[in-house]
């Protein structure tokens, strides 16, 4: 199997990449099996809670036009913060191994994520995030939202220099309440990541294609 991953700033950019892929000679030898479209996003429960408190202090009625406008403005400030902007407009992590899986939050009887109060969801995600942070430096995680774009609600990409890290991280998260009670997972895909110019090596089947780290270009 061969998985292509492409980041673009617009949907038109994704469409252009798809068109170019369809037109190349290699496409005639490939049989498409799956595709996934999503947008990079950040978990901002803590920041959102602070924004809610700020708007309430200003006397704004929850979810009124004034509230929504002020909320969007403050959230945009968060998106433009250097720490967050670098993650929202990231490039594909250049690590040797990759694992991808889609997931949903459950909406089943008492296990309905979307019926929980915001504060409870924030608490659960804080605990969930602590597990991920315990693997800091060992894995690069990219979360993307796909509600309205694909069959699942989120896509999770994990990149590491040791594939065993994927197993350890995902196993630990299985015991976290946000996952154990409220998460539903799709199929997992994992493999070796390699540079585009190593495609001929992969197709020849004579050696494992290499992953060459390319320095980021400052724009």
Q: Which residue stretches match the model-derived regions?
A:
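C-terminal structured interaction module
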Residues: 161-209
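Short, glycine- and small/hydrophobic-rich beta-strand elements in well-ordered beta-sheets
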Residues: 1, 27-42, 128-153, 169, ...
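Catalytic micro-motifs at enzyme active sites that drive phosphoryl/nucleotidyl and oxygen chemistry
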Residues: 21-24, 87-89, 142-145
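Active-site loop/lid in soluble adenylation, ligation, and acyl-transfer enzymes
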Residues: 5-14, 22-28
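Short S/T/G/P-rich N-terminal loop/turn motif that feeds into the first structured element of a domain
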Residues: 9-13, 41-130, 200-219
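Short amphipathic alpha-helices in soluble, non-transmembrane regions
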Residues: 16-24, 168-174
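A cross-family "folded-core" feature that marks the main globular domain of proteins
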Residues: 15-19, 31-34
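Short, well-ordered beta-strand segments in beta-rich or mixed alpha/beta enzyme
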Residues: 1-10, 98-103, 148-173
